[in-house]
């Protein structure tokens, strides 16, 4: 990755946003799908200082759990309590005011590589912006794309991005697992570019308009035009069948979904036999992906659009916008996380004039 190009891209995006929304942007939320996102479920317990559980006790036990998550080369993205315990009682959602002696917590900690996080911070701060929080992409995609019942009953959010595929598992209304791997939709594009001897730009266009992972109804005689590679205008275009595209695209998508299946089998999702899978991200829009995923994962699957943000224009309601929409939802749930003293997240709730102007800009700009 070229950090200078990344910085220029951030500057252009921020400049455009400031012009359209008529606000000066001083701080941002940053989502990441890189850095080998991983999860740990940790337990910690303390003796409570008074007869009943206080806010201070909750802070102390969360701090004890988060300290156990510190690993060389890793940085914490999220630290979320899953359930509390008090003496022999388990599964407590809100322990404040309850009477007991030994107070514990099961906490989910999501981390990423420190080097990746530092480079992202460097790019953003080089644009004279403060980073309010760095969040895991599949988590915020889930915030915008999952229905409440799905998060409560159990679901896996699979964000099929360009360079990565990331996973977030939800159960009991809680975010309980995250991970990812560095294969995504851009790998399908590169397979097409090589297989068809065409440019990456044309391969992406062909994938978007003609790509599919299911063979039903595809005729070998159904041909499409493929521009040649190179700058010689005299070279005639080639013609390939849509069945040829299928033979190039499907193996890579199968590989991605099989890796997802294996990761889910080793995650808390395996304990939820009736839980469903929700797909987001640009690569999830390939024709037939939901059907193929149902076969490979053996779970109910749907391709999701952002649900958690009202007022989005039609062009920003697709699966590819789930992460972006989730960043608008995240400030409303950020207070559920544990933050180290001095690093508390003071995020806008999305209820003021800024959010209204942002929504107006989105509607007017697309």
Question: What feature does the model see in each segment?
Answer:
Residues 1-157, 174-175, 185, 198-246, ...:
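Nucleotide/phosphate-binding catalytic cleft detector across ATP-hydrolyzing
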Residues 151, 172, 265, 292-298:
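Short, solvent-exposed amphipathic alpha-helical segments in soluble enzyme
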Residues 272-275, 305, 318, 324:
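Hydrophobic multi-pass inner-membrane translocation pores used for secretion
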